């Protein structure tokens, strides 16, 4: 079996929180490392560096146009969210809202991951994220990663201290790339 040509694809990684030094951004580190190891070109959408508008609010849409362009050029998307109060983050939803309707995510293969402080993980937020993304036409692939008790998994250095979780996070790249280039 031939190895897929990972360099032929472009991936967009979406950080679904604007909190500095968040556990969600830490969970993306092994994924970003895996993309780099495999020489996969990628773009990171970091909402802390953007000024996105809430629906119905008039204003400058420069950053919305920027993320629409980035996502429209992607062959696949990796979407992350923390679980806040039993839900995906408002920031993750705001990013989705700024991608338009019909959404530029329609028809895009995606993998999703969530992090939560509780022992139940990010199951609720991932269910909601999957529903919303599917509704707008994204192809959400099986195998989401939910990181429970996230404060015990990632150290202050940002590194994942659980080899099983790190393997699953890195595996999201393979799931996505296998779909894009079977």
Give short role names for the model-derived ranges.
Residues 8, 106-107:
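A glycine-biased structural micro-motif
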Residues 43-54, 101-103, 136-156:
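Mobile beta-alpha loop/short-helix "lid" or hinge segments that flank ligand
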Residues 109-149, 163-164:
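Short, glycine-/small-residue-rich phosphate/pyrophosphate-handling segment
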Residues 58-59, 91-94, 118-122, 136-139, ...:
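Short amphipathic alpha-helical patches
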Residues 1-101, 159-182:
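N-terminal beta1-alpha1-beta2 submodule of the flavodoxin-like/Rossmannoid cofactor-binding fold
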Residues 17-18, 49-52, 112, 117, ...:
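A short, flexible beta-alpha/helix-coil linker loop
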């Amino acid at each position: 079996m031939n190895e897929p040509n990972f360099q032929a694809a472009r991936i967009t990684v979406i950080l679904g929180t604007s909190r500095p030094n968040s556990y969600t951004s830490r969970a993306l580190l092994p994924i970003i490392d895996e993309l780099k190891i495999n020489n996969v070109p990628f773009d990171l959408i970091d909402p802390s560096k953007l000024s996105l508008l809430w629906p119905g609010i008039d204003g400058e849409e420069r950053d919305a146009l920027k993320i629409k362009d980035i996502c429209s050029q992607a062959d696949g998307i990796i979407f992350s969210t923390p679980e806040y109060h039993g839900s995906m983050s408002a920031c993750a939803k705001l990013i989705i809202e700024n991608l338009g309707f019909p959404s530029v995510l329609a028809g895009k293969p995606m993998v999703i991951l969530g992090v939560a402080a509780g022992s139940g993980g990010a199951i609720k937020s991932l269910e909601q994220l999957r529903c919303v993304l599917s509704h707008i036409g994204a192809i959400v692939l099986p195998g989401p990663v939910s990181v429970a008790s996230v404060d015990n998994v990632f150290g202050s250095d940002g590194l994942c201290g659980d080899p099983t979780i790190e393997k699953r996070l890195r595996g999201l790249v393979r799931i996505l790339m296998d779909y894009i280039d079977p």
